[in-house]
Amino acid sequence: MSGRSKRESRGSTRGKRESESRGSSGRVKRERDREREPEAASSRGSPVRVKREFEPASAREAPASVVPFVRVKREREVDEDSEPEREVRAKNGRVDSEDRRSRHCPYLDTINRSVLDFDFEKLCSISPSHVNAYACLVCGKYFQGRGLKSHAYIHSVQFSHHVFLNLHTLKFYCLPDNYEIIDSSLEDITYVLKPTFTKQQIANLDKQAKLSRAYDGTTYLPGIVGLNNIKANDYANAVLQALSNVPPLRNYFLEEDNYKNIKRPPGDIMFLLVQRFGELMRKLWNPRNFKAHVSPHEMLQAVVLCSKKTFQITKQGDGVDFLSWFLNALHSALGGTKKKKKTIVTDVFQGSMRIFTKKLPHPDLPAEEKEQLLHNDEYQETMVESTFMYLTLDLPTAPLYKDEKEQLIIPQVPLFNILAKFNGITEKEYKTYKENFLKRFQLTKLPPYLIFCIKRFTKNNFFVEKNPTIVNFPITNVDLREYLSEEVQAVHENTTYDLIANIVHDGKPSEGSYRIHVLHHGTGKWYELQDLQVTDILPQMITLSEAYIQIWKRRDNDETNQQGA
């Protein structure tokens, strides 16, 4: 080998050794940098919150370029309260420091209770999502999430609104610092969002006449508060107000434990009606409300969904149709059936009657042929037992002619005259497309709360006509004993009823409005409610209205004895 080639060989060997030395020192340096990375990240205030010994092996073995993505994802996933998250923070020694911040949050004075309204759907104001919804307690808006890049987090940074309430867990948080706030001064907000009642409080509701004061200073009686008319839902408002003043039904829904464990088939949406009605009852009777009215927005959305848009918020509906559908839907959603299984709805409102039906020959037939047909079995009177939720009372036909002053005559009829339909003697003819029938009705069981629906609207081929006849009725002491047969009278000790709710329809059939008169049991006074307006009214004025739906309460033994004394 020549001298030149020997020198080149020694040079190449030396170069390899230097490159290997540089490569190994580079690897050592990179490993040292990787070991220092958590310390450097914590000193820079990085969002990394979990020490490396708690990271999965995949995260430890990942290249340095992937680690920041893992951190961001981990931070965004830590959103809801969970025990594993708290355990990890405890191992890191962060629980004590967070507890100190939780109990001494500096932003509690920024909460604005006057803008808080929990009556509307728990929906993010930016993304249409119900999941993980938070309410900003500074401006009252709803946002989704509280992790990094969530709408609530961005809102807190952009507008310096720091206090948020989880609308499902009822926990308070400070953002963007992301720690839970624990303070007893926030209990009033939690109670407005989800009112609760003890058995003792429920038992005393009808014995108290104490006024409550809202946050804005207005006073109100719990249970006698206005319902917001979103557009054309006053027909539903009146019915819901009436049902909220029926004590057994109200008491059942004020206590959520009575119905929350009822099992329904998978995918059943009807139970939503029960949940929303219970929430509305608790809000109407909340003595610690921030305002003296309630919005039935969530309740009506459930009605629209469960009725398949038969009843809507934006279109006027019929109060009797809505009442009939709502009571039957509520009964079904609570697990009731038509014949056997009972619910609170049937216990309160369901009565029974005998219906006697007799088919009539066609009026155009000769008299001899009619006489022969009446001897056939088909034309003999039949009787069936039937249950009812309400009684329909028929009004006499309104006059077509005007008086001498060119004004329409508004007739009047006593309540007992139209109740004669159910005395078991009075017959009424009913016509179908092909056949005519004579029917008579006799009551066999009177419910604790009796609903009268006065039939004011009749439909023909062209339009709906309203009967303006005024029904004269007493406010108290309506005895229905004479409408029962003798054997049924022996079973019923009390047959005397007092009025507790009176729904009125004013105006034309398609353009009219609804209002309601309700009795407050604690004060013994009557109040008129029309949407948000609440005024007291004299009992004598109630009888002058065009009553459409009435709810009567049967007296018990104690009340009857007091009246007799």
From Swiss-Prot:
Instruction: Write down the species.
Output: Pongo abelii
| Protein family per UniProt | Belongs to the peptidase C19 family.
InterPro entries, A to Z:
Papain-like_cys_pep_sf (IPR038765), Peptidase_C19_UCH (IPR001394), Ub_carboxyl-term_hydrolase (IPR050185), USP39 (IPR033809), USP_dom (IPR028889), Znf_RING/FYVE/PHD (IPR013083), Znf_UBP (IPR001607)
Q: Tell me, what does this protein do in biology?
A: Deubiquitinating enzyme that plays a role in many cellular processes including cellular antiviral response, epithelial morphogenesis, DNA repair or B-cell development. Plays a role in pre-mRNA splicing as a component of the U4/U6-U5 tri-snRNP, one of the building blocks of the precatalytic spliceosome. Specifically regulates immunoglobulin gene rearrangement in a spliceosome-dependent manner, which involves modulating chromatin interactions at the Igh locus and therefore plays an essential role in B-cell development.
User: So what does this thing catalyse?
Assistant: Thiol-dependent hydrolysis of ester, thioester, amide, peptide and isopeptide bonds formed by the C-terminal Gly of ubiquitin (a 76-residue protein attached to proteins as an intracellular targeting signal)
Where is the USP domain positioned along the sequence? 225-555
Q: Which residues bind Zn(2+)?
A: C136, C139, H155, H161
PTM annotation (Phosphoserine): residues:
S46, S82
**Zn-finger regions (UBP-type) at which positions?**
103-200
Position(s) of the covalent cross-link Glycyl lysine isopeptide (Lys-Gly) (interchain with G-Cter in SUMO2)? K51
Name the chain's protein. Ubiquitin carboxyl-terminal hydrolase 39
Could you list this entry's UniProt keywords, alphabetically sorted: Cell cycle, Cell division, Hydrolase, Isopeptide bond, Metal-binding, mRNA processing, mRNA splicing, Nucleus, Phosphoprotein, Spliceosome, Ubl conjugation, Ubl conjugation pathway, Zinc, Zinc-finger
